[in-house]
Regions:
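A domain-start/cap signature at the N-terminus of enzymes
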Residues: 2-41, 52, 201-204, 213, ...
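Serine-hydrolase catalytic machinery in alpha/beta-hydrolase-like enzymes
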Residues: 20-131
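Conserved alpha/beta-hydrolase "nucleophile elbow" surrounding the catalytic nucleophile
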Residues: 45-47, 133-138, 188
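Short, conserved loop/helix-junction motifs that constitute active-site signature segments
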Residues: 63-66, 175-180
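Primarily recognizes the serine-hydrolase "nucleophile elbow" in alpha/beta-hydrolase
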Residues: 124, 131-178
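Short, proline-enriched alpha-helix->beta-strand connector loops that line the catalytic pocket
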Residues: 178-183, 211
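Short beta-strand/loop motif that positions the catalytic acidic residue
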Residues: 185-187, 191
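C-terminal catalytic histidine-bearing segment of alpha/beta-hydrolase fold enzymes
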Residues: 197-243
Length: 243
């Protein structure tokens, strides 16, 4: 599908900020190119990947509004991961056990969420209103997205959680300013890495807390499919068009 999109349709930037500023390096895409950027989507990758993982699907997302969106795909730091025998790889936090309860390093996850807060702060400083910023993530990145968005101090546009789980549901201190934030959860019914039961558990937890959640299930494994990309585009168009 990428080949059908002219190269000039989107602008790609790679940003590397000073480490002492505690801003994560990231790949950026402004789409469609030439339109004034009025919204941002911060999209976190999964375990072992990097910010380039989801950047290629940007031209496939059909957005129905007449302004540009800045997609920001940060790179996770490389750390030892217990479930992979301590192998050092890009990860937002350590996973200690792959059982149904997902024993993870909560402090590392919260630290990653604080890095996302700084990316949000930077987008606001670039002129994007907080309620035009979506926080998204796949797998590990989705778990961080829940924590980052629900604890942020200003109202955000939404949370997009793909093939993930709500790792900090029992410890999170939700900022009431984002108590009604819209949430999109997408999950593969054949996912062997993050079973769909964890996606449904996130759904029930958030609904019990009063959140507006849209849930989609697809007959795929731990991946994103074309129908999911279409649903993502529709949801983003509604959320950013209404916010």
């Amino acid at each position: 599908m990428d080949s059908e999109i002219p190269n000039e349709a989107f602008l790609i930037k790679i940003t590397y900020c000073e480490k002492n500023m505690e801003i994560l390096p990231a790949v950026e895409k402004e789409f469609p190119n030439g339109k004034e950027v009025k919204a941002s989507i911060i999209w976190l990758h999964g375990l072992g990947a990097d910010g380039n993982d989801f950047a290629p699907i940007v031209p496939q997302i059909n957005l129905s509004f007449d302004f540009g969106v800045r997609f920001i795909f940060p790179h996770a730091p490389s750390i030892p991961v217990t479930i992979n025998n301590g192998y050092v790889m890009p990860a937002w936090y350590d996973i200690k056990q792959m059982d149904v309860d997902r024993h993870v390093d909560i402090e590392q996850l919260q630290e990653s969420a604080s890095w996302v807060h700084k990316l949000i702060d930077r987008e606001i400083s670039r002129g994007i209103p907080s309620n035009k910023i979506i926080v998204a993530g796949f797998s590990q990145g989705g778990a961080v997205s829940f924590e980052a968005a629900l604890t942020y101090s200003q109202p955000l546009a939404g949370i997009m959680a793909l093939s993930t789980y709500f790792a900090t549901s029992e410890t999170i201190k939700i900022n009431m300013i984002n108590k009604s934030i819209p949430v999109l959860i997408c999950h593969g019914s054949l996912d062997p890495v993050v079973p769909e039961s964890l996606g449904k558990k996130s759904l029930s937890t958030l609904e019990s807390l009063g959140f507006d959640v849209r849930y989609h299930s697809y007959p795929v494994d731990h991946s994103v499919c074309p129908q999911e990309i279409e649903d993502i585009g529709e949801w983003i168009s509604k959320i950013l068009g209404d916010s």
